[in-house]
Structures are given as structure tokens and as C-alpha cells.
A protein has these predicted regions:
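Short, structured segments at the rim of ligand-binding sites
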Residues: 1-360
Length: 360
């Protein structure tokens, strides 16, 4: 493929698919509680695999690379009384740890076996009624482990109480899960490091069909923020809320503070517009803790590289245990476009900007 530098077309309007994070949570909630009609569902492979798994009658579920599906479905199948399920995935998925979640579920009374290596998929899950309610879990682990438990909490006979030990990673994703539980009628509390989910009561839950329109995906929006920052042209994005459930909506602040891209919301049209400030003075460097929004760090680093802004980004420990080691992958790809970097277990720092490689 031959790429030639060109000018960005201004004032274009883009429709982005629904948030993967919201969609995957909704698919579980709809299956557990019913009466939810989902609009603007994510077209991501993760969400498609989640839908397929929830509809499957097979004893074996293969979720390929879909980490969210692996985690959410592990808890879901653990409470499907009388049903035995084997959940597996790609070779990379079999290298991604799941022990913290399995240990927590076993503490609650779930019956789960490792079929190959302890602490890793594939899993054999024998669904049963769970009556225990209290569990402790390290707070620094992936928020998806914790959200997985929260989503089933309302279906447990005595509810669920989780004590999070240590500093919480990706807190906005936990808050998203709890807000969504509230929206569908599941009562919950989050005080300091303790989360409580109260047992589902029919009177609290919506009795008629609930229409839930999924707002578009802020992680996907990051690419268009990057285009606006580099190309300095306006871009309109549809189906975004001013007050978003998604932690990655912090994009608005990051791209304004460091790259001069202003976000204007139009609630009447359910749209946001990205306006690059042409007189913006770019900072001499950027330092940012992205512990609460690690998934957009790659886009931020690419944007900073294109604009030749030295950067130091921390809070990225979870990127090393994704479908690939995203920190190593990011370092390799940035080198191709002229940015030498230094990485640690949870950070990346730019060292030098040079010319991009001729052939990438």
C-alpha cells in the first residue's frame, strides 16, 4: 500500500459503532434479566462473539481473542444452574491470566476447573446456585475481573459484597458497570473500597421493555481526535453523550490540554464536534498518568509523535496482558514512524524523534 501525505477534508460527519464496553455489559444484563432492547450495539468482534456465546447451546464456547467475553462469561456460566460449559480461546487467550477471577468465584462457591494450565483458560465451569456473598479481591487487577462479578451480583441469592484491596485500577470502568446496573434497576453502593450489589427484586426492575441506546465508542473516537489534532480540521462524531459513562471520554480533556482540540457537544443532535484551535501553543512536553484510561494511550502516543511533543505516559500495566503485549507493540510501531522510546512494566517515554522509515 502506498500512502501519500494529503490534506484532511474539513467538517466531515462520522458515525462510530456503539461502545464495546457498554455493549458487552448490556448483553450480559439482557440475558440475566431480560426486557432490554439494545440499539446501536457495538459491531466489534468481541461483542459479536459475546452474542454468539450467550445464544449458543453448545457445551464448548470458543471466544478466540475476546478477553472481555472470557471474563464476563466465566461469571455468567458459573451461575447457570445445572449447565456445564467449557470456555476456551486462542493460544494467546490461553496465556492471559484469569486466576484472580476464578479464585473470587470459587470463594463464593462456584465450581470451576482449569483444563490445561492452572490460572489460565480453558476452563470447565459447572453452573450452580451461589449463596455466599462476601469476597476480597486485589484492586490493582483488570477492572473487567471485578465488573464480571458485579454484573452477576444481582442474581445471587444474597447479593454480593466485594472488598477491593489496594489501589483501584481503571475505576471509571467499575463506575460504568454500577451506573448501568442502576439504570436497569439493580441497587448498588460503592463506598471507599467496598462495593455492594443488592439481590434482584422484581419490584425494583423495569417491568416493561427498556430501550437502551448505546452511545458510540470513545476508544474508537480517539482516532478521529488524533486526525483532528494532526490535520487541524473540524470533525463531527455522532451518537455521543455530553455526560458519558465511558472513562475514555477523558479524551476531551487530554486533547484540549495537550493538542488544542476543543469538543463542542450538541445534545439536541446527539453529536460532538472537534475543533482544533489554530492558535494553540503546543506544550514543550507532556506527562500523563493514564491508569484510568490505558486503552487510549496508544493513540495519544501516536498523536504526540506526529506533533513532535516529547511524552512520558504512566499507568499502563494492563496493556502488557492484552491480546498482545501492547507496550512492546507500541514501541515497535512508533520506531517505524520516527520515535525512539523507552518502556517499563507500566510506562512509555519518548527519547528522540527522527524521520519515519521509508517502507513500513
Amino acid at each position: 500500500m502506498f500512502l501519500e501525505k494529503s490534506k484532511l477534508k474539513g467538517n466531515q460527519t462520522i458515525q462510530i459503532s456503539g461502545s464495546k464496553s457498554i455493549s458487552n455489559r448490556l448483553l450480559i444484563l439482557e440475558k440475566l434479566f431480560g426486557n432490554i432492547l439494545i440499539e446501536n450495539l457495538s459491531n466489534s468482534q468481541d461483542s459479536q462473539l459475546m452474542q454468539k456465546a450467550l445464544a449458543s447451546k453448545s457445551e464448548t464456547i470458543d471466544i478466540h481473542h475476546a478477553g472481555t467475553a472470557m471474563r464476563f462469561l466465566t461469571s455468567y456460566f458459573a451461575i447457570q444452574e445445572g449447565k456445564t460449559t467449557i470456555i476456551t480461546g486462542s493460544e494467546r487467550m490461553k496465556q492471559r491470566p484469569i486466576q484472580f477471577l476464578v479464585d473470587a468465584l470459587k470463594t463464593l462457591g462456584a465450581e470451576i476447573e482449569y483444563l490445561e494450565n492452572d490460572g489460565f483458560p480453558p476452563l470447565k465451569i459447572t453452573g450452580k446456585k451461589i449463596t455466599e456473598k462476601f469476597v476480597q479481591i486485589p484492586a490493582h487487577i483488570s477492572s473487567q475481573f471485578i465488573s464480571s462479578l458485579l454484573l452477576i451480583g444481582g442474581k445471587l441469592e444474597n447479593g454480593l459484597e466485594i472488598e477491593l484491596i489496594g489501589e483501584i485500577t481503571s475505576r471509571p470502568y467499575l463506575e460504568m458497570t454500577l451506573k448501568m446496573l442502576s439504570e436497569v434497576g439493580i441497587q448498588n453502593e460503592f463506598h471507599e473500597n467496598t462495593v455492594k450489589i443488592f439481590p434482584y427484586k422484581k419490584d425494583d426492575f423495569h417491568s416493561s421493555l427498556m430501550n437502551y441506546k448505546v452511545e458510540s465508542d470513545w476508544s474508537s473516537a480517539s482516532y478521529f481526535y488524533s486526525l483532528a489534532a494532526i490535520g487541524r480540521e473540524n470533525i463531527n462524531l455522532k451518537s455521543f453523550r455530553t455526560f458519558s459513562l465511558q472513562g475514555d471520554s477523558i479524551l476531551r480533556e487530554i486533547y484540549w490540554n495537550f493538542f488544542g482540540v476543543n469538543t463542542i457537544s450538541d445534545e439536541s443532535d446527539y453529536q460532538i464536534s472537534l475543533y482544533p484551535e489554530h492558535t494553540f501553543q503546543f506544550p514543550e512536553k507532556m506527562e500523563l498518568d493514564m491508569n484510568n484510561c490505558p486503552d487510549i494511550a496508544q493513540t495519544v502516543c501516536v498523536t504526540a509523535t506526529a506533533l513532535k511533543i516529547p511524552f512520558y505516559i504512566t499507568g499502563l500495566a494492563t496493556l502488557k496482558v492484552k491480546e498482545t503485549d501492547r507496550l512492546v507493540a507500541l514501541q515497535n510501531e512508533l520506531k517505524k514512524i520516527g520515535c525512539e522510546t523507552e518502556i517499563t512494566e507500566n510506562s512509555i517515554r519518548s527519547l528522540e524523534f527522527t524521520e519515519a522509515e521509508e517502507n513500513i
